[in-house]
Each structure stands twice: as structure tokens, then as C-alpha cells.
UniProtKB/Swiss-Prot annotation:
GO terms, biological process: nonfunctional rRNA decay
Location of cross-link Glycyl lysine isopeptide (Lys-Gly) (interchain with G-Cter in ubiquitin): K16, K35
Keyword line: Isopeptide bond, Ubl conjugation
Origin superkingdom: Eukaryota
Region listing for Disordered, in residue ranges: 1-98
Further facts: Present with 1230 molecules/cell in log phase SD medium.
Keyword Translocase: no
One GO CC term on file: cytoplasm
Chain segments annotated as transmembrane: none
Annotated Basic residues bias: 38-50
Protein name, UniProt field: Uncharacterized protein YIL161W
Listed Basic and acidic residues bias regions: 51-60
Organism expressing this protein natively: Saccharomyces cerevisiae (strain ATCC 204508 / S288c)
Length: 235
């Protein structure tokens, strides 16, 4: 009997022990789970802390050494000079273009006004041809020759940039040109360069041609004109 009781008691004690072991297993799992969660939290905190540190380092300017500081200052100064030069050039270009436009308008107005004066005053002064760079007006003169007075149709070519460029005298293509008219044309065109610089109007230049025609026929006209100008300066 005693032997059976001891065996039975041993079995019961083993059953209790095994029961206690089974009851302790969930507690152990819960503790390990909590440890894992805490470990993850710590790792996440460390990651966030590292990210903040990296971001801060990126945002904060790096210390500049002496050589780098000089290079940065030179680059900034160069950029400022380039910006100032571009601004100044732009202003100068705009100012210059405005001046050109104003000067061109004055030039065109002066040219047109002088042409209209010739048309109004001279009945034979008529438009002959409009070109890309010059406008030609026909005019008839009556020079005296050895065989008497003749009528010739001449052309005054007025450039579009007159009075910057002088007018130019030519003969109409179907007109018979004598040698003395070649001399007249060459001498007048030489004189016209001087007259436009002295601000002679187109009408006054035409009057000069008509009134000085006999002198313009001379081969030594340039010498005569220079002597005449020297004489007038002494008066």
C-alpha cells in the first residue's frame, strides 16, 4: 500500500509540475514580444535621430577655408561685374537705338521737305524713277554751245540717306552727252559733296549748277573754285 501511495504521489507531483510548466509558457512569449517591441522602438529612434543629424548637416553651411573663401569672393565679384556690364550695355543699346530713330526721322523729314520745295518751285523738276537706295528726278537745262543754246534732260539722284550722302548729277540714258557735259557732271558732283556739308538745300544746289554752268564746263574748275573760296575767306 505504501508503495502505491508513493507512486501515486510522485505522479501527482509530476502532473503539477508539468501543469506549472504549461502555465508558464504564455508569460515567456509575452516577455519576448515586449522585448522585441522595445528593441524596434529603440532602433526607430536611432534611425530618426541619425536622419535629423544628416539633414541638419546638409542644411548647415560647411566651414569655408581660406582658399575656398577667396575663390567664392572672386566668383561673386565676377558675376556682379558681368551683371552690371550687361545692364549698362543694354541701357546704352536702347539709348543709342532711340537716338538713331530720332536722327533718321529728322533726316527723312528734311529730305522730303527739300524735294517738295523743288517740285513746287521748278516746273520741270519731276519724278523719274524710284530705286531701292536712290530716287531720281528729271530736270531740263539749256546750256550754250558753239552751235547755240540746246536743251538737255539731266537727272538728280537723291539718295535715301540724304543729307548724309550728297546728290549726284547724271544724264538721261537717251541724251547725247558731249565731252563738256562729262566735265560738268564730274565737277558738279565734286562740288556737291562740299555743298551738302555746308548745309546747302537741294534747290540751292540746282541753282548753283544753272548759274555756274559755264565755269563747271572748264577743265580747271577745281583750281578756280579753290582760289575763289580762298578769296572769299579773306573778305
Amino acid at each position: 500500500m505504501d508503495t502505491k501511495l508513493s507512486v501515486t504521489g510522485a505522479k501527482k507531483s509530476q502532473g503539477k509540475a508539468s501543469g506549472l510548466g504549461n502555465e508558464g509558457t504564455p508569460i515567456g512569449n509575452e516577455e519576448s514580444t515586449n522585448k522585441a517591441k522595445n528593441g524596434n522602438k529603440k532602433r526607430n529612434k536611432n534611425r530618426n535621430r541619425n536622419k535629423k543629424t544628416e539633414t541638419k548637416e546638409q542644411n548647415e553651411p560647411k566651414p569655408v577655408t581660406g582658399g575656398e573663401e577667396v575663390r567664392v569672393e572672386k566668383s561673386q565679384a565676377k558675376n556682379r561685374r558681368r551683371k552690371n556690364n550687361n545692364g549698362a550695355n543694354k541701357k546704352n543699346t536702347l539709348h543709342y537705338s532711340k537716338e538713331i530713330n530720332v536722327e533718321e526721322r529728322k533726316q527723312i523729314a528734311k529730305r522730303q521737305e527739300e524735294i517738295e520745295q523743288c517740285i513746287h518751285t521748278l516746273s520741270d523738276f519731276k519724278l523719274f524713277k524710284k530705286g531701292k537706295h536712290v530716287t531720281s528726278y528729271g530736270y531740263r537745262i539749256s546750256p550754250m554751245t558753239d552751235s547755240g543754246k540746246i536743251s538737255l534732260k539731266i537727272l538728280f539722284n537723291i539718295p535715301l540717306d540724304y543729307p548724309k550722302a550728297p546728290i549726284k548729277l547724271t544724264m538721261k540714258s537717251n541724251e547725247e552727252v558731249s565731252s563738256y557735259m562729262d566735265t560738268v557732271i564730274a565737277n558738279f558732283n565734286w562740288k556737291a559733296r562740299q555743298l551738302v556739308k555746308e548745309d546747302w538745300r537741294i534747290l540751292s544746289q540746282i541753282n548753283y549748277l544753272v548759274s555756274e554752268l559755264e565755269i563747271l564746263k572748264m577743265e580747271n574748275y577745281k583750281q578756280i573754285d579753290k582760289l575763289r573760296n580762298s578769296f572769299y575767306k579773306t573778305i
